[in-house]
Amino acid sequence: EYYLLAGGSHLQKDFGSTVNEIEKDGFQVYRNVDIEMSQDTLFATAKAIGTGILSLSKSLDELRPDFLVVYADRYESFAAMITGTQMNIPTVHIEGGDYTEGGALDDSVRHAMTKLAHLHFTTNQQSSNRILAMGEESWRVNTVGFPVIDLIAEKRYATSDEVVKKLSLDLTRPIILFTQHSVTTEFEDSFAQLKPSLDAIRELSGRGV
């Protein structure tokens, strides 16, 4: 038996209220956890972690679960990990030990969560090695792979025709796939850091791409 707690951006309209997608996939959400994140500032993030701890502690005190599963390294997850360990609930961390290029804040939060967690399920051996190097006992560290690979193996993804239709792609022209990870500690400069990439894409577009 599981109890699913949803919070953070899952509940925010600006991010698509993705809690609805969770329920649409057949998962019952036990409770929506209020983690206030009204602004994109350093103060708001710190406040959201505190709000998350307060909200999550009420739910976990009511549930008294055998263990708590926490995913990745977002601020909501950080709040959940702190709450679980402080309430003496065995915690399981998924995707610990990963490394983000550029010294992003993600690494500090992720590794802090690793030291709070009791069991670790990593996506690759290098991540497991980093956790072991932090002094975690080997029996606590399990290399299980990236969960999304299961969806790919089961072919649970949109077909190429569905992607073309949804994104209105013109297959007679080359396609550019672009992604850029912002430096989380330099969010005020994020547009200036992104602009050269946007200029490059604009230049390519001018050449008929």
Model-flagged regions — what are they?
Residues 11-16, 117-192:
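A nucleotide-sugar donor-handling region in carbohydrate enzymes
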